[in-house]
Amino acid sequence: MKIADSTVLVTGANRGIGKALVKEALRKGAKRVYAGARQPFAHADCRVTPVALDVTNAAQIRAAVERVDALDILINNAGISLMNDLSDRAARERLLAVNLFGTYDVTQAFLPVLARSRSAIVNVLSLASLAAVPFDPLYSISKAAAFSLSQSLHALLAGRGVSVHIVLPGPIDTDMTRNLDIPKASPESTARAILDGVEKEEEEIFPDPMSEAIAEGWRGSALKALQRQFAAYVEQTPVK
């Protein structure tokens, strides 16, 4: 899937990786980039269309679909981390609403547009999808659930010409990791690696040094083999 001359929608596009993805899509020659955010922002490039899009707001999702008449690449980037403990029910519900159900609801809403032609869905997750981060268990749970969703979508949509790419970054230098004193990749290099991975049609994209270090091991793992085995059971089936 080439970025040049494509139409792209990025959720969570107002900062961090999302903002960098908008810039990188433009650099690669995207024809139109819809920048979805809870607080839309103006952009100097006329190819960018700001869209009010809170991924937990059904009315805003419907309105966004009505604005987008064609779409080649949907990038589900919106996500949050609250650093709360497991006993906080409100935090559990909020994290799942954004990181899991937000991804699903946006995907489901745009699927009729995406399925009109060969297209791609890019779900920006985390290495916490594969192994829990003990000091942020709720975030890890939500991302693990979104990873399972993404694997399912990959199998279910393969017969409809819609590819699904799962992005598994390590720590990135964004507001979310501001207080973590650990090595971090830049949003710009991460965005570049993500879109390079989409163009190379990589199923899983490991876009930074920390994640890249485990890429080969993951692709040759028993868990990956099991995923392929389960995916082989799936016939072309509508998403439910």
Predicted regions and their residues:
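Conserved glycine-rich cofactor-binding loop
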Residues: 14-15
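Active-site loop immediately N-terminal to the catalytic Tyr-X3-Lys motif
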Residues: 133-137, 180
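C-terminal helical subdomain
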Residues: 166, 174, 178-217
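Residue(s) in the substrate-gating loop at a strand-loop-helix junction
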Residues: 126
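Conserved NAD(P)H cofactor-binding loop of Rossmann-fold oxidoreductase domains
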Residues: 77-83
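Active-site helix of classical SDR
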Residues: 96, 107, 142
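Substrate-binding pocket helix/loop in short-chain dehydrogenase/reductase
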Residues: 84-94
